[in-house]
């Protein structure tokens, strides 16, 4: 574990693991333009930081109260989805990533450049993303993908270095003791959390 890192901060690395798997799967490189929908969640906050460290131009889609957080994490542009239609930002992207499973390829396709890819971390509303990802695989178009997390050699050391140098920050919203795990779950279900919610087993 990185020097000076608390155990609760180390736990949030799970979001970074999945975010990294997505970025590796889409082959994000320096200069690519990426829009991350749901950039304030566990996966999204990690993805903004990792994408920026790859040299990509990052647009984060968040609610009003998370705009400053998105910029703090390194996003080049932050869009408030509560006050404007994020699909009408006036730019096109190499990649659009849904980090919370609440949008679809059909809703976002006009944001994509020719040959652009829509990646989802969830099946999406009514399972649309899963069906489209399957079709993309069959046709080899790769326009819609749902990357499966897999072990990537060296990632732990990479993230450790980033955290020790202050280039990756663990974003923790709330902490609950194990006895209040039901309350934690209810809070997560509100869709209002930022970063990750931690269950502190040792507190009991």
What are these regions (language model features)?
Residues 51, 70, 96, 108, ...:
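Terminal peptide-recognition signature
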């Amino acid at each position: 574990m990185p020097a000076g890192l608390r155990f609760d901060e180390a736990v949030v690395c799970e979001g970074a693991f999945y975010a990294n798997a997505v970025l590796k799967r889409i082959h994000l490189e320096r200069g690519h333009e990426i829009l991350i929908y749901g950039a304030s969640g566990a996966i999204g906050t990690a993805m903004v930081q990792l994408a920026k460290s790859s040299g990509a131009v990052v647009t984060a889609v968040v609610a009003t109260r998370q705009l400053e957080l998105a910029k703090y994490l390194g996003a080049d542009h932050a869009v408030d989805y509560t006050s404007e239609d994020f699909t009408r930002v006036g730019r096109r992207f190499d990649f659009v990533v849904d980090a919370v499973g609440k949008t679809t390829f059909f809703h976002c396709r006009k944001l994509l450049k020719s040959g652009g890819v829509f990646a989802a971390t969830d099946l999406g509303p009514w399972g649309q993303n899963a069906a489209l990802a399957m079709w993309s695989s069959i046709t080899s178009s790769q326009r819609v993908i749902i990357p499966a997390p897999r072990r990537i050699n060296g990632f732990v050391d990479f993230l450790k270095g980033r955290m020790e140098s202050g280039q990756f920050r663990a974003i923790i919203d709330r902490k609950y003791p194990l006895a209040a795990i039901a309350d934690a779950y209810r809070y997560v279900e509100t869709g209002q959390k930022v970063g990750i919610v931690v269950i502190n087993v040792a507190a009991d």
